[in-house]
Amino acid sequence: MKQVILVRQDLKMDKGKLTVQVAHASVEATLNSSKKTIHDWKEEGMKKVVLKVSDLKELKKFLIDAKSLGLVTGLIRDAGKTFFKRPTITCLGIGPDDEE
């Protein structure tokens, strides 16, 4: 089992902001998962991978594709109070689910 987290590169987040947004995406997608899925994922070491996408359009394409496959997602919208000037979609968590 694996969780995938996609991060927008066009936002040019600093390392601290990026790290927090990735954590939010992981937690949100996990909280949207079933207890059995979470248990199985934990038993297998909670594998995750962070990948980059170019922009919001590409992120939304992956969101649509993931949902069409029945995968659990967690879309993160930053509140826009520190790094960004307004609410901004930053990351997408997908899964955990089977690696295929």
Please state what every model-predicted region is:
Residues 58-64, 71:
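Alpha/propeptide regions of enzymes that mature by internal proteolysis
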Residues 23, 28-57:
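Compact, glycine-rich, soluble single-domain proteins
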Residues 12, 39-42, 84-85:
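Generic, ordered loop/turn and secondary-structure boundary motif
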Residues 12, 56-58, 99:
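Generic "edge-of-domain/loop-turn" microfeature
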Residues 16-18, 62, 86:
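Short, well-ordered secondary-structure micro-motifs
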Residues 2-33:
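Glycine- and Gly-Pro-enriched alpha-helical subdomains that act as flexible
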Residues 21-23, 64-68:
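Short, solvent-exposed amphipathic alpha-helical segments in soluble enzyme
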Residues 4-6, 44-54, 68-100:
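Short basic, glycine-rich beta-strand/loop surfaces that mediate nucleic-acid
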